[in-house]
Amino acid sequence: MSRTGKIKRRTVESDPIFANRLLARFINRSMRDGKKSVSQRMVYKALDMVKEKNLDPLVVFQSAVQNVAPRMEVRPRRVGGASYQVPSEVRGDRRISLSIRWLIQAARNRSNKQYHTFADKLAAELLDAYNNAGEAIRKRDLMHRNAEANKAFSHFRW
């Protein structure tokens, strides 16, 4: 069987409250065990907490995702038996996916003593990312440092 056909990309429907596709992707990614309504409730609660700080929740969310999105990454490339970490630019869709994944992971890793619910953790992480701080921003900076350190191997890109 030949593999000539292109796979059609599935589009995500925008979320019901803010009518935003990026937020819908975020909700889907934060979902556990297929419980979307629980995920929606927690994300919207986190955005309400951001709103209580007299900030526009959608602007904070979008800025946080953009701030965390990496521009460069390293990819392994085998050349003559040796494997090199070759820095390359991150394409648009992968940037957003990594950003969403890191924000959710950073929120889940926050302390349960200080932040009792996932909504508390997520609100804190979104505000930190909005202000260019927090664990997700550290992860992005680590990736950029790694790409910078392996700049010597950038000629292996093809």
Q: How would you name each of these model-derived features?
A:
Residues M1-D33, S37-Q40, Y44-W158:
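Strongly charged
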